[in-house]
């Protein structure tokens, strides 16, 4: 019986995407056609985030605008801050992130708008706030 149980996500298809692919013959993972290892070697984190969101690597001007927008979206709401402060001291960081992202989604002004433009804005806000929430949780937990 235990031989039939698959470990982890082996053989499990969660969904299909045009963003990333596993290329077994190259032993590589790709994002938008670029090997992840090459992106790690040659790009900043923000450049890769831009690539994932927009489908192409940014120009210097696009990257500057992207970074400025990300920085302007870092502020956490009082609700999220209070919830982080109330979390158990032994909370796992992934549980904190999951809870904070759920709260961000509930508070987001574009929650019900699923247009491509609104979805990119929602991702940008989550992208900006998540590391701040995690850092704050490490201080309080």
Task: List each model region and its residues.
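Hydrophobic alpha-helical bundle cores within soluble ligand-binding/oligomerization subdomains
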Residues: 1-139
